[in-house]
């Protein structure tokens, strides 16, 4: 994340290198195709999948909380947030309303719902907890990270309160809701956020209870380095960040224990290029394949670095990203079946890391793999085959949006329309932006803000999963200058005004080239 330096409107405008404009134009092409395709998917595939009788979104034929609510619904929300706010605030938001009305079962903990027969499907306790935790971590957190303290935050808060109210597992440190390491890793990620968003002590107390439960094992190191087990790596990293931010007494203890975890994984669980295996030591069958969650795990390492104030693992991350240039990772078969989900997860992790450790070889790898296997950008936009709505395909849509916003540096054009292009690139002075449209367009160019602080209550932009990374952000109270590179005109705006949106008009086929500082 970069917050720009601001200069007065009267300052002498710096010269913009032609290469910066060329890079922004190329980013506009990449992001324009991606966002227009996502908008097609939203209207042609996803919104029609909402059941007209219940209002639920049975994206894969079911409404449950382990897959549909956790992995499909959040990226329906992201797609609407980026390309159609009316859809977000209409049928997409209504899914949130009806799932609470129909599915709440144990207080506000939901259960799956048979939308065809109109009845709840009540699982055993462990599955109930697992599904609700999945919904919070993969679903609601992802939405809250981009919408802030909206109704999705209220839902997240309610479920977490009741998950811990009904915790049944006795430990020497107090009751916890599960012995499942995946659930507990998810809980660490949720509780750390809720603590900083609310200031309520019970959330960090519960998170410490989980950390103490695992660190009570003298040599605790998670064995599974991919999903359904690796969640605790990033969860412990984020907890350390929050402990450090709030000068809590356990911060130093957790720092030492977590370094042992990280060093052991590097020593035993990585190949020579820094990519992680599915299992820390086992190499039989699928265990010997590379984990598509390698980037998720390194997010925890970078969070550790930022928390302790030393770049202990940054070089390891940089080297790993640079090694992606090697032929071995060209169209690597992450899931063993060339699933879109394997590519999408691996690339998502890489984007999180590139946001913190920019490495040219890593950006090139991401662009190439996205174009071929996830966005599939060689297909004509008007006739391109769209993604489905089941969870593996929805994860693809997630990463398409993340990749597109990397190329816009977090800028969003509202309303989006097919044929619009928007791209941006950093310069030493700020940002260069290129926009064009094949049809007349008028709307607002909306800039990102430091959501980590404004929404999440984080002192720093702690590296974390289940978010849209911050690229170029504006400080609400600061003054910025937008310069038209073709006319030379300069327009002052505050960060708040830029976040709400700068009014623009595009003539068909005529590019607007702008610089902001």
Where are these regions (language model features)?
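Glycan-recognition and catalytic cores of secretory/periplasmic carbohydrate-active enzymes
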Residues: 4-516
């Amino acid at each position: 994340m970069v917050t720009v330096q601001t200069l007065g409107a009267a300052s002498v405008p710096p010269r913009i290198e032609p290469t910066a404009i060329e890079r922004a134009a190329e980013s506009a092409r990449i992001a324009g195709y991606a966002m227009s395709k996502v908008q097609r998917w939203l209207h042609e595939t996803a919104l029609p999948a909402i059941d007209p009788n219940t209002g639920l979104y049975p994206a894969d034929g079911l409404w449950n909380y382990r897959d549909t609510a956790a992995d499909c619904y959040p990226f329906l929300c992201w797609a609407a947030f980026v390309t159609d706010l009316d859809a977000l605030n209409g049928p997409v938001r209504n899914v949130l309303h009806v799932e609470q009305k129909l599915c709440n079962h144990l207080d506000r903990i939901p259960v799956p719902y048979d939308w065809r027969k109109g009845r709840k499907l009540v699982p055993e306790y462990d599955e109930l907890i697992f599904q609700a935790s999945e919904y919070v971590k993969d679903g609601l957190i992802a939405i809250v990270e981009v919408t802030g303290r909206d109704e999705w935050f209220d839902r997240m808060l309610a479920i977490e309160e009741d998950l811990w109210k009904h915790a049944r597992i006795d430990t020497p440190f107090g009751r916890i809701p599960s012995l499942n390491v995946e659930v507990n890793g998810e809980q660490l990620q949720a509780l750390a956020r809720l603590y900083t968003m609310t200031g309520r002590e019970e959330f960090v107390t519960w998170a410490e209870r989980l950390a103490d439960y695992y660190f009570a094992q003298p040599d605790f190191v998670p064995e599974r380095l991919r999903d359904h087990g690796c969640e605790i790596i990033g969860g412990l990293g984020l907890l350390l960040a929050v402990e450090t931010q709030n000068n809590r007494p356990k911060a130093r203890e957790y720092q030492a224990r977590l370094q042992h975890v990280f060093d052991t994984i590097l020593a035993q669980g990585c190949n020579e290029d820094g990519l992680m295996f599915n299992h820390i030591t086992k190499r039989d069958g699928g265990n010997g394949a590379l984990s598509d969650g390698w980037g998720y795990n390194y997010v925890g390492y970078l969070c550790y670095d930022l928390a302790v104030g030393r770049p202990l693992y940054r070089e390891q991350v940089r080297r790993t990203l640079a090694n992606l240039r090697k032929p071995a990772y060209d169209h690597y078969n992450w899931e063993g079946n060339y699933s879109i989900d394997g590519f999408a997860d691996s690339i998502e992790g890489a984007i999180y890391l590139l946001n913190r450790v920019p490495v040219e070889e890593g950006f090139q790898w991401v662009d190439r793999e996205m174009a071929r296997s996830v966005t599939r950008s060689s297909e004509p936009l008007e006739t391109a085959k769209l993604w489905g709505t089941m969870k593996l395909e929805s994860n693809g849509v997630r990463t398409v949006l993340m990749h597109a916003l990397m190329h816009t540096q977090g800028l969003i054009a509202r309303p989006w329309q097919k044929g619009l292009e928007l791209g941006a690139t950093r310069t030493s002075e700020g940002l260069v932006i290129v926009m064009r449209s094949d049809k007349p367009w008028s709307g607002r160019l909306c800039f990102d803000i430091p959501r980590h602080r404004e929404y999440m209550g984080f002192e720093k932009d702690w590296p974390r999963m289940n978010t849209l990374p911050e690229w170029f952000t504006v400080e609400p109270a600061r003054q910025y200058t937008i310069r038209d590179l073709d006319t030379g005109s300069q327009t002052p705006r505050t960060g708040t005004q830029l976040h709400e949106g700068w009014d623009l008009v595009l003539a068909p086929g005529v590019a607007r080239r702008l610089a902001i500082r």
